[in-house]
Design a protein with these regions (language model features):
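Ligand-binding clefts/hinges and TM-proximal coupling segments of bilobed small-molecule sensing domains
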Residues: 138-152, 194, 229-265
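Periplasmic-binding protein-like
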Residues: 30-32, 105-109, 192-229, 253-261
Length: 265
């Protein structure tokens, strides 16, 4: 090998080593919330994919840790994670976290059986009904305030699957859930026959925005958030942001079906 080729080879190796060193790792705590966040879906779900790409364009390699939602919050708040995703804004969370620019627009609706002639315009229209709900879950301050008036009863369980099972058994009348999350749970856990029994009311219970939260306990969070927000604004401006959700509607984040095992007989 000539000295010139050796020199060029060393320069290339040095360049690649520098790029690898600059690829910093970000650890982000998340909860399971398919199709937005799920260890079982392609790219860990559409929001995980979006977050990964946003940070990759800023030179970071993102690693997600799926935890129960309360642990995802508390572990990030103490600085064990660089960020946590995704969360509704609540004033009390500002003590622990910086909030990014809005990352996800959600639409919460009431799921119900098609056999139920259900209509609503005001919360009082729900009086006397039994609702399903998620553990420690907020459906927005206005509906939370209505629930506190005890005009309806709400039976909270840990998963969407459990809530839909109760709905099918008529143990609850309504189940408030984010629309894409609800239909993803139905597709994943229920037969086509059971899916066909359930619909949602078109009037949204809540149109909500969710955010990436970065812990105030970490000194670098404000600078990291500024870079994230700038890149997110670029994605929205160029239309790239919308392509992730177009892919979601086309089923591109669904897990690959497991092929049947071949028999030796």
């Amino acid at each position: 090998m000539t000295p010139r080729r050796l020199y060029l080879g060393l320069c290339l190796l040095l360049c690649l080593s520098t790029q690898a060193a600059e690829q910093k790792v970000l650890n982000i705590s998340v909860g399971d919330w398919p199709p937005y966040l799920s260890a079982d879906m392609k790219h860990n779900g559409v929001i995980a994919h979006l977050i990964s790409d946003l940070f990759a364009d800023e030179g970071y390699d993102v690693r997600f840790q799926f935890l129960p939602w309360p642990r995802a919050y508390s572990a990030a708040a103490t600085g064990r994670f660089d960020a946590t995703a995704v969360w509704m804004h609540k004033a009390e969370r500002e003590a622990d976290f910086h909030f990014s620019a809005p990352l996800l627009d959600e639409q919460f609706v009431f799921f119900h059986l098609k056999t139920l002639p259900f209509d609503w315009h005001h919360f009082d229209d729900l009086t006397g009904m039994t609702l399903g709900g998620g553990l420690e879950y907020s459906y927005g301050p206005q509906f939370d305030e209505f629930l506190a008036q005890n005009k309806v009863s709400i039976e909270r369980v840990s998963t969407a699957m459990q809530n839909f099972e109760k709905l099918l058994k008529e143990r609850v009348v309504l189940y408030p859930q984010e629309m894409n999350v609800g239909y993803a749970a139905l597709r994943s856990h229920f037969s086509e026959e059971d899916q066909a029994k359930i619909t949602h009311h078109p009037t949204p219970l809540l149109i909500n925005r969710s955010y990436l939260m970065l812990p105030k306990s970490l000194e670098g969070s404000p600078a990291l958030m500024a870079r994230f927000n700038k890149r997110l604004a670029d994605y929205r401006k160029t239309g790239r942001y919308d392509r992730y959700f177009a892919d979601l509607q086309q089923g591109k984040y669904q897990p690959e079906p497991i092929p049947p095992m071949e028999s030796d007989y």
